């Protein structure tokens, strides 16, 4: 199957350009904010709409700074250390989910400390809405023809323009489906059916656990990062970074359900 060659740039006016990738971040944050407000209205956790509104700026900074530094330090440090100015060129791509997640957690901690908000209540809300952004981000990765999968002979293999001429797994779409849509449904079902927000850290634990399981599995189909390759002969960086998430998530689930 030939890649549906979609221009990564939606439109441009002079040097100013709007890309699908940047738009996915904007829409993801707005939809996440809207969904989080609906959750707060229904369940009235120890988070108010005003708290959420005040946190948006912290969240955006955490996502961008954490995501970018995570990519720079974990995936291609030699390039950026030799050309530090490139670190600021986020429009060229290069964001790490694990770095962004850590950035948001740090931002949430600083916010909660300043405004005297319960940290676990806030991170439970964040975890519940994050799959929206994950779904949109992976779709944008697919449009950009980046982060594609390994070579496959299956009928749904796609020839990406930025790779060789071999058909490859559309691993971005696998991630969009499982880390985005399926994970969103799991957390929505847990939240609305089983009222998991009543148990602090349970939604956070569910998110970390299922995201890690999905990511570790889908990495089997995803081409390892060229500048890193395999680690310990068979593991990818994404799998290694997801293992601590799996351990922490499982621990939070056990701790919150046994109380």
UniProtKB/Swiss-Prot annotation:
Topology versus the membrane: Multi-pass membrane protein
Keywords: Cell inner membrane, Cell membrane, Membrane, Transferase, Transmembrane, Transmembrane helix
Superkingdom of origin organism: Bacteria
Subcellular localization, as worded in the UniProt entry: Cell inner membrane
GO CC entries: plasma membrane
Pathway: Protein modification; lipoprotein biosynthesis (diacylglyceryl transfer)
Transmembrane spans: 16-36, 55-75, 92-112, 117-137, 172-192, 201-221, 228-248
InterPro entries: Lgt (IPR001640)
Entry's Gene Ontology molecular function annotations: phosphatidylglycerol-prolipoprotein diacylglyceryl transferase activity
GO process terms (BP): lipoprotein biosynthetic process
EC number: 2.5.1.145
Record-listed a 1,2-diacyl-sn-glycero-3-phospho-(1'-sn-glycerol) binding positions: 138
Main function: Catalyzes the transfer of the diacylglyceryl group from phosphatidylglycerol to the sulfhydryl group of the N-terminal cysteine of a prolipoprotein, the first step in the formation of mature lipoproteins.
Protein family (similarity comment): Belongs to the Lgt family.
Protein name according to UniProt: Phosphatidylglycerol--prolipoprotein diacylglyceryl transferase
Native source organism of the sequence: Rickettsia canadensis (strain McKiel)
Gene of this entry: lgt
